[in-house]
Every structure is written in C-alpha cells, then in structure tokens.
Amino acid sequence: MKFTVFASLFASAAAFAPAQQAARTSVATNMAFESELGAQAPLGFYDPLGLVADGDQEKFDRLRYVEIKHGRISMLAVAGYLAQEAGWRLGGDIALDGTKFADIPNGFAALSAIPQAGLIQIIAFIGFLETSVMKDITGGEFVGDFRNGYIDFGWDSFDQETKLRKRAIELNQGRAAQMGILALMVHEQLGVNILPGV
C-alpha cells in the first residue's frame, strides 16, 4: 500500500519537472486521432507516452475501450465509496457466521474484513461479467457499446449529435472518476480524510 502512495506522489511530482524534448512525430500521425471523441479542450489530443503515435486505429480503439470501461468502473467506485462514507449500508448478513454488512469497514480495510468465500464470490461474479455480459459488441455503434439486447435506456431514440455529446460527457466523467477514486485511495492510506465533515 505504501508503494502505491509513493508511486502516486512521484507521478504527481514528475508533472512539475522540466519536460524533455521528445522526437517530433509526423503531423499526419498525430492528425489521425485529433478529431476523435475525447480530444477536447483544453488539452486536445493528449498522448504524452506516444501509445498511438503509429496511427494504428485498432490499437486506438482498444485503448479507448479500456479507458471507457475503467471510467465506468471508477464512477461506480466513487459513488460506492461516498455512499459508504455517508453511512449507507446493506441490511442483513454478509456471511453465515453472522457478520453484518454494517460491520465491514470502508476502503482497503474491507478486503481483510470480508470472509474469503465472499471475496471468491466477488471475483467469480466479476469474471462472469467480463466474459459473458459486459462485452464490447462486435460491429457495435461505437467502441464501448455494451448494449446486448437488454441494456438500452432509450439510446436509439437520440439523434447523432446528442449521442456524441453524451459519449463525450461519459468519457470526461470517467476520466475524472479515475482520478477521484485514486485520490480517495491515496488519502485513505495516508490517514487523511478529504471528505468534509467526516
């Protein structure tokens, strides 16, 4: 856990170090993704590590899929973390031995408090979702399109401009949630609560 804290501190300190001059890539390569969703103000297209410098669309789509998926998971993680900090808990027992949901602490401490059989069930359920339910539709409308005949929420009733705007909102909120859950985890390990009144 301390390694995670130090790694995040090092990464944030590196943001203020003088930047090295990287080799210039061709304008044509960078232009390949400048009009993609997510290349928004104020940064525009941002690829400091050059992950898609070769202009490979398949690689870009895979990275975008992973970014969207991690963003969605992070949004749920932030909401869950804040709900638990607010005192909202499931009723009943988490295990047959009488351990209640209310007895499970927040954050990393929950991993050691949940019975091993419960952790195995959680991992198995996530594996089931990964392999069977939450799969990117081959030939879907866009990368990260998980509609599988059951999940729609009226998406098909929106016009193209509205769909693009909503996808941009989801992408930005997912990026913010990834930073948010990381900040909550780092501060938890530092023993500093950043939530007001808690």
UniProtKB/Swiss-Prot annotation:
Molecular function via GO: chlorophyll binding
Subunit structure: The LHC complex of chromophytic algae is composed of fucoxanthin, chlorophyll A and C bound non-covalently by fucoxanthin chlorophyll proteins (FCPs). The ratio of the pigments in LHC; fucoxanthin: chlorophyll C: chlorophyll A; (0.6-1): (0.1-0.3): (1).
Localization terms from the record: Plastid, Chloroplast thylakoid membrane
Family named by the database record: Belongs to the fucoxanthin chlorophyll protein family.
UniProt key word Transit peptide: yes
Summary of the function given for this chain in its UniProt record: The light-harvesting complex (LHC) functions as a light receptor, it captures and delivers excitation energy to photosystems with which it is closely associated. Energy is transferred from the carotenoid and chlorophyll C (or B) to chlorophyll A and the photosynthetic reaction centers where it is used to synthesize ATP and reducing power.
Membrane protein topology class: Multi-pass membrane protein
Native source species: Phaeodactylum tricornutum
Keyword Transmembrane: yes
Transit peptide: 1-31
Gene3D superfamilies to which the protein is assigned, alphabetical: Chlorophyll a/b binding protein domain (1.10.3460.10)
GO biological process, one term: photosynthesis, light harvesting
InterPro entries attached to this UniProt entry: Chloro_AB-bd_pln, Chloroa_b-bind
GO CC terms: chloroplast thylakoid membrane; light-harvesting complex; photosystem II
This protein's UniProt keywords: Chlorophyll, Chloroplast, Chromophore, Light-harvesting polypeptide, Membrane, Photosynthesis, Photosystem II, Plastid, Thylakoid, Transit peptide, Transmembrane, Transmembrane helix
Matching Pfam families: Chloroa_b-bind (PF00504)
Protein name, entry field: Fucoxanthin-chlorophyll a-c binding protein B, chloroplastic
Membrane-spanning ranges: 73-94, 114-134, 174-196
Name of the gene encoding the protein in the UniProt record: FCPB
